[in-house]
């Protein structure tokens, strides 16, 4: 089922028993985090806090707190269906030439559907039903969460940031956390390689000293939100991809103060600029690692205008030691990644990002090994093929007889098929998440690959061990006798 906007999604969740309305007053300061954390760990519903303490605007939390709700937001009926979305993205990322006329005709509907999902620009939009400008702008009217005791200030977490570099037709969508530092100012914490930061850098080079337009959408429809965190090919805009997920074109509206286009059905829009050179120290904040991060300087976003729907809903989350929403998103999007990786590396049988590895810091790959050194090729491919994995610190590669999602299997493979010196690959001076305080230099560190595959001639001179396999006939006989044995 597809959802036109966030409210449509809320209704759909409520009909399925996947959303709970909270009538008891709960504070955005620490209390919502506690409630959402307990609910997420219990695999509970999305939460709509209708009476946040001190505010008139309800808060939506734990929206993507289960993989099943992530799948619903992407228009799928089950998590397993996300593999089909991954296959579509794999095809769009590297479309193969048709093998003949019949093949060309079979692929034509896919391209026609992609072309037909170009965003639709509208003149009037519900996200601009109410307009607040100038001195009336006050972020303090929004129930922005203060998530952890050591957090320095309230933090906008689910803001969909819209930017466009100079001479670019395509807008960039990214989700960057934003520290509130005044009634109309937040710190835009984007890393140097992210799309928003690249757009800003190019703008400063081409338009020195000129303010850089930015917009932030809060409470967009689920397909647009999830499109911003999915590995969409560079040839496809996030808005068009959201249209494919939703089954109809994404409606956009031009901002009141710039040429940026924002989701027309979003709940709240922040419009404004970044003045080149205006920076501020950001943090500390508790983040998805389970620790407070160090303080660092990032650009300041000045909010010149807030537009919103009548009676808006504020969409929020928290990040902390897994499990949290980013970890759950990682579990669901894992199914999207598998076909994309298999398109480039057909020998891969499964790919798994353990949620306890902070969503992306460790990957386990199983493969059909075909030659000596094959595992190392796959390791390097994982690190380089998708930008989502440039911060993955550990890649474990093993054979397809191992269940990548079962640590009992994985640890057995590591301890029996690896020699630490021969089978460990170390790569130094590579990009690392700025939030990773374990790296010796901020943003720069090392990576480790573990080859836990059976070794081939050329990789070892010794006779390799054979896996013990039970006798099937004996297993069947004991199955038949088991109840008579009275053991359980």
Curated annotation (Swiss-Prot):
Coiled coil: none annotated. It is a peripheral membrane protein. It is found in: Cell membrane. GO terms for molecular function: 3-octaprenyl-4-hydroxybenzoate carboxy-lyase activity; metal ion binding. Keywords: Cell membrane, Decarboxylase, Flavoprotein, FMN, Lyase, Manganese, Membrane, Metal-binding, Ubiquinone biosynthesis. Disulfide bonds: none annotated. Its EC number is 4.1.1.98. SUPFAM superfamilies: FMN-binding split barrel, UbiD C-terminal domain-like. InterPro entries: UbiD, UbiD-like_C, UbiD-like_N, UbiD_bacteria, UbiD_Rift_dom. Its main location: membrane. Its cofactor is prenylated FMN; Mn(2+). Prenylated FMN binds at residues 175-177, 189-191, 194-195. One of its GO terms (biological process) is ubiquinone biosynthetic process. One of its GO terms (cellular component) is cytosol. The active site is at 287 (proton donor). Mn(2+) binds at residues 172, 238. Pathway: Cofactor biosynthesis; ubiquinone biosynthesis. Binds 1 prenylated FMN per subunit. PANTHER family: 3-OCTAPRENYL-4-HYDROXYBENZOATE CARBOXY-LYASE-RELATED (PTHR30108), FERULIC ACID DECARBOXYLASE 1 (PTHR30108:SF17). Homohexamer. Belongs to the UbiD family. Catalyzes the decarboxylation of 3-octaprenyl-4-hydroxy benzoate to 2-octaprenylphenol, an intermediate step in ubiquinone biosynthesis. This is 3-octaprenyl-4-hydroxybenzoate carboxy-lyase.
